Amino acid sequence: MFMINILTLILPILLAVAFLTLVERKILGYMQFRKGPNIVGPHGLLQPFADAIKLFTKEPLRPATSSTTMFIIAPVLALTLALTMWSPLPMPYPLINMNLGVLFMLAMSSLAVYSILWSGWASNSKYALIGALRAVAQTISYEVTLAIILLSVLLMNGSYTLSTLATTQEQLWLLFPSWPLAMMWFISTLAETNRAPFDLTEGESELVSGFNVEYAAGPFALFFLAEYANIIMMNMLTAILFLGTFHNPHNPELYTANLIIKTLLLTMSFLWIRASYPRFRYDQLMHLLWKNFLPLTLALCMWHISLPIMTASIPPQT
């Protein structure tokens, strides 16, 4: 029975990822005054399936000088971790109801760094290695602010369980009292998922395509799936944290529909940002975090800790 539950979580995620690639190409196409994919199926709707068949039927090439085992393990690990991170998300009922769901997700996203590092190192290519080192430095850096912002939000929530955020936000979305945190959180999620304007890992002019430059066919598709699954997951987490959805136990489908609409709107903004903004320089990327975001998030975190004590109250015990 538990296996069926896992499959009913994983298959829709993979399907959503497949169509997200199509939506991205369509939106970027229309923003650049062209059509986007429109040949395969009606209005190009079957394009993701054509891409999947093409990728998985090609021969997975492997550089002669690469470290075979690690080269193969890295993409599998990337996708496994990306899918595992979905398990504590309440939609409205999580796959595994954890007391420390938020910490679990942070730990999993930290482990995802290893798949990037291994893929870059095992490829035995200077471009892949530099791309991997950039990606790792960026991901680790932005995780710091993500963790501090999460802590600040959880101080208002009074619990590490994600499900209780729906109860906390019945009266008011946390977006309103903590909008600076929400803005920094959104920008940090862009950087965490290596999306434009923070896609420094795949600077075509200098690194060809980043840490996955030596990958082809199936393993490349696994990295691709992991990246897009992370994008949807991060946006869903943003919707749960800051745009709390009202949960009526008698009608849980309403919660799911509401959450999905918010997640889709956030994902659209990811694509809109990609079409609008040029790539940051690497030093600007690091300055933004260490000189701007970190002091601000620390100050706001201290504020969220001290305010309840100052007003002689405690966080809500939900």
Swiss-Prot record:
Regions crossing the membrane: 2-22, 70-90, 100-120, 136-156, 172-192, 222-242, 253-273, 294-314
Family matches, as Pfam families: NADHdh
Enzyme Commission designation: 7.1.1.2
Molecular-function GO terms, alphabetical: NADH dehydrogenase (ubiquinone) activity
Reaction(s) catalysed by this chain's protein: a ubiquinone + NADH + 5 H(+)(in) = a ubiquinol + NAD(+) + 4 H(+)(out)
Quaternary structure and interacting proteins, as annotated: Core subunit of respiratory chain NADH dehydrogenase (Complex I) which is composed of 45 different subunits.
HAMAP family per record: NDH1_NuoH
Protein name: NADH-ubiquinone oxidoreductase chain 1
